[in-house]
Swiss-Prot record:
A motif (Nuclear localization signal) lies at residues 482-494. It is an enzyme of class 6 (ligase). The modification N-acetylmethionine is found at M1. Belongs to the class-II aminoacyl-tRNA synthetase family. Type-1 seryl-tRNA synthetase subfamily. The gene is Sars1. Its EC number is 6.1.1.11. It is found in: Cytoplasm; Nucleus. Residues 470-512 are annotated as: Disordered. This is Serine--tRNA ligase, cytoplasmic. It comes from Mus musculus (Mouse). The keyword Chaperone does not apply. InterPro entries: aa-tRNA-synt_IIb, aa-tRNA-synth_II, aa-tRNA-synth_II/BPL/LPL, Ser-tRNA-ligase_type_1, Ser-tRNA-synth_1_N, SerRS_1_N_sf, SerRS_core, tRNA-bd_arm. Pfam families: Seryl_tRNA_N (PF02403), tRNA-synt_2b (PF00587).
Amino acid sequence: MVLDLDLFRVDKGGDPALIRETQEKRFKDPGLVDQLVKADSEWRRCRFRADNLNKLKNLCSKTIGEKMKKKEAVGDDESVPENVLNFDDLTADALAALKVSQIKKVRLLIDEAIQKCDGERVKLEAERFENLREIGNLLHPSVPISNDEDADNKVERIWGDCTVRKKYSHVDLVVMVDGFEGEKGAVVAGSRGYFLKGPLVFLEQALIQYALRTLGSRGYTPIYTPFFMRKEVMQEVAQLSQFDEELYKVIGKGSEKSDDNSYDEKYLIATSEQPIAALHRDEWLRPEDLPIKYAGLSTCFRQEVGSHGRDTRGIFRVHQFEKIEQFVYSSPHDNKSWEMFDEMIATAEEFYQSLGIPYHIVNIVSGSLNHAASKKLDLEAWFPGSGAFRELVSCSNCTDYQARRLRIRYGQTKKMMDKVEFVHMLNATMCATTRTICAILENYQAEKGIAVPEKLREFMPPGLQELIPFVKPAPIDQEPSKKQKKQHEGSKKKAKEVPLENQLQSMEVTEA
């Protein structure tokens, strides 16, 4: 996931000032651009010097061959003249004036210079890449410039009544329909662990089937992805911070051979976007085959580091969940990827409109975008029980930022002489099932249960096609009685703790 290096090179038509400005708008370090330009300039000088040294080495070999052919004297172990040791000014005439033994010494010295130059070049290349991968994509002009997501995300449009309030939040409703086991889930799997059960399993499967059918009717190919990826591939699709804050690492045997003691490092996927992005790694995609549209289905795993204390109850923010994802490879020409961007968010909107879930679309501020996204729109559903908007969908155009690192190229240049182009890559959530279930529960709660959205009824089993009944009391309604019981038990305990002499004094007063 990187920008084109030529964008940093003025002599190649690049504009480092523009990238510096982009970094400032993202509220990231613009100094990375200057560090990269410096490392790249030194790298290019080093490569130029290495190329010249290799030419000199070839010239030495050619000159030796010519002298041997003429049967010139090889010469004794004579020293090399000082003027010849300046390789920047070394000419064919200067070499021709030397003995064969001297030229061989020069060639050895050139070899040493090449090795030194190659070492410097590798070091500079690593330094350049470290800066390059931490510099974000160029921003679309419509992105709001701010570092305050809560205050400055721009609301683009609203659908449905986002003022309605209802009694219960999803935290209570998952318990009331007996579709969730959180305490035992936490014992088995740790923090945010859960068992989804009963009617909510059927509701989740209904959402998956409906989402896949919807995308299938729009030309998307359903694809069920691997749940883990090799480290070297994950490094090409995830930014550095994700390895610490989001991804789970898995260690396993390097192969199926019983005598193989090597170990392989892999990472659980946070979204099917990651393996689908790598699906066409190292390929040339033909213009006539684009756009390529995938409906990714997978379980997703996220550490959620940094969300401590947020949404700790219920199933809205969990470490493991199912998700259907839109993913598209697009042409980089004629604004095609931005047309596809509009189409993808529209598809998500139609899906939630068909489910009758009110929402608004927000344009995410520059400071909250990940490195790859040039622009991101979120669909935030209205949760009438919580009295808040909550994110259900994120739609991003990453332009060629991901494709460049994955080497997914556009077309094929004539005789491979033209500048290589890369496809544009886009992703958008269609349905993260646990979050969508929460939205349905809050919006469709009624006196006796949860009304099933009409579009999902054909996917539900008999007895649950119209209503998911409440079978347990709401935890929030039980909290006052629990609190009173606790206070009563506390009073009894305090009474027992009263010293004996105080009790006797009390009895004497009563008798008097």
